[in-house]
A protein has these predicted regions:
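Structural helix-adjacent loops and short alpha-helical linkers that scaffold large soluble proteins
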Residues: 73-87, 130-145, 190-204, 247-261
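Well-ordered alpha-helical segments within folded domains of soluble proteins
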Residues: 59-74, 115-132, 176-193, 233-249
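Long, well-ordered core segments of solenoidal/helical folds
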Residues: 2, 19-53, 83-102, 140-162, ...
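Long, hydrophobic/aromatic-enriched structural stretches that serve as scaffold segments
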Residues: 57-118
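Carbohydrate-binding/catalytic loop surfaces
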Residues: 19, 29-55, 101-122, 160-181, ...
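Hydrophobic, well-structured mid-protein blocks that either form specific transmembrane helices
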Residues: 130-180
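Extreme N-terminal leader/anchor segments
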Residues: 1-21
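Hydrophobic alpha-helical segments and helix pairs
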Residues: 94, 99-149
Length: 287
């Protein structure tokens, strides 16, 4: 899928109710996942992915993003049905969280590397919002377990690379570094800090590490999906722009705004877009 467009890849611009420094709307707009995705819900209202053979699988990332989109719709529209949708997703997160605090995301394709920092962060963002509204400690407890696992080094079975100089949050523990997954994980860390005041230094350390790594995600005319040269689809390029804007609003680091503006310039240049499309097509053929 060269254009990166599907019900699972709806545009995720800057969140419609996002406010930096406030545990309110989410950083990215996930609302279309709710508004367009109600046909793929089970009897409990939880999203599922349908395979070509008709079988269903429930993916943590899909569920957490659906919950965040529903929460945003509740913030915007004040319709309790949307809050209930978000809460059901948070309850699913608790019911399916493993003892180590993780959710197995890649169990079906990478059984030896099933964990990811990205859904850990997204789950935390959902759980702390539901905790804020309900004051039910089970949501905060699950979020704390998720953060602790997310900050466990990959050498110890976790999903980050950490040492005295950097803190990198890994979407894949066995594949090249992916930027969007790192940032989604960062968003969860920031949300947990907003609620509890904890892990501020870890957030700052990872932001600084990301700042140094940004050069690896810019090929000069388009953004890169990963640090080893896989070019971003239009969907991921647009997502990178929104994430850069959100990070700038949160951190006030000018470099994130500079990259947001740079990526937007790339996006508006038709020649750049065609060049990126051609390279993406070639990479798809050789994958």
């Amino acid at each position: 899928m060269l254009t990166g467009k599907s019900i699972y890849h709806v545009n995720q611009n800057l969140g419609k109710a996002f406010e930096p420094g406030q545990l309110n709307g989410y950083f990215n707009d996930m609302t279309q996942k709710v508004l367009m995705g109600d046909k793929n819900l089970d009897e409990k209202g939880i999203p599922f992915l349908e395979h070509s053979d008709g079988s269903h699988v429930q993916m943590p990332t899909m569920i957490f993003q659906y919950g965040l989109g529903a929460y945003d719709l509740w913030v915007i529209r004040k319709e309790i049905d949307y809050f209930n949708k978000a809460k059901r997703c948070a309850d699913w997160a608790i019911d399916h969280q493993e003892d180590n605090g993780a959710w197995s995301v890649f169990f079906y394709i990478y059984p030896n590397a099933p964990y990811s920092a990205m859904p850990q962060g997204e789950a935390v963002s959902l759980l702390v919002r539901i905790y804020k509204e309900t004051k039910d400690e089970k949501y905060l407890s699950a979020a704390e377990k998720a953060i602790k696992f997310m900050l466990t080094d990959v050498r110890d079975g976790g999903v980050c690379k950490c040492n005295d100089f950097e803190l990198i949050l890994l979407e894949y523990t066995h594949l090249p570094l992916v930027m969007n997954g790192w940032i989604f994980a960062l968003f969860g860390l920031y949300d947990y800090f907003l609620l509890t005041g904890e892990y501020e230094e870890e957030f700052k350390e990872s932001v600084n590490s990301l700042e140094k790594a940004l050069v690896h995600f810019d090929c000069g005319y388009w953004s890169m999906y990963d640090e080893e040269g896989k070019i971003a689809s239009p969907f991921y390029h647009n997502l990178h722009i929104a994430q850069m804007k959100a990070l700038y609003m949160v951190t006030k680091k000018k470099i994130f705004n500079e990259y947001a503006e740079r990526f937007e310039r790339y996006q508006k240049n038709r020649l750049n877009e065609l060049r990126a499309f051609a390279k993406k097509a070639m990479q798809k053929l050789t994958d």
